[in-house]
Amino acid sequence: MINRDLIRRKIVQLTYAYYQNGNHNMDNAEKELLFSLSKAYDLYNYMLQLIVAVTKEARKRYDVELARAQREGAEAPSQKFAFNRFAVQLEENKMLGDWIDAKHSSWDDDIEFVRKLYTNITASEVFQEYMASEEDNYEADREAWRKFYKNFVMSNEELDALLEEKSLYWNDDKEVVDTFVLKTIKRFEQENKADQELLPEYKDLEDRDFARKLFRSTILNCDQYQRYMSDASRNWDFSRLLTWMWLSCRLPLQRW
């Protein structure tokens, strides 16, 4: 999941922080980079877990409605959303389960947000279309959750604020993580059952080494890059350039 574009983005942010905080400890800065990247992967799993949390809430509502229908002799409610095939498969996914166990992760502390998200989804036109559709199969269930995620999880200001409170590392990561979640939903296949592979933290170990080497090279060769910038822009008024803009110009020199 952690690709080279995300790595470069993180390096720009952390190189800026490296020079701003004045504590030029390369080893600590490198550890911070790798930790920041690992937090992006945590967010990816946490967003997948949100789908499971909403599904569990739907199942609780279904159980209440079913019990009421049985008492009153009424027609049983639809279980289409509560037992959405894709969401059930995700709930049983071994890789996600291992991550949840390792991180002791849960949405229980934010159940009110989960309930609000459930309400927003079930009150929507896209939900009504899903429930009314005669297409009742795995592919339709998977596509429904792709739409729910795109419409109600992406660009969700309340969720953004909630995530920022949980980790400052997630403040700038959600937009790119959302694309990986949508990619993951699209890749799910029913026949893979609980063994469906999620995106790995790194596509290969070379990407982790790439992050370390690029970061070190950017820091260690800073003075040389500064001379390059000065020679290439003699007529610029550097006193009016923002540090962030200047830093962003340096990193492309290190594109490998």
What are the residue ranges of the model-derived segments?
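Class I Rossmann-like S-adenosyl-L-methionine
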Residues: M1-W256
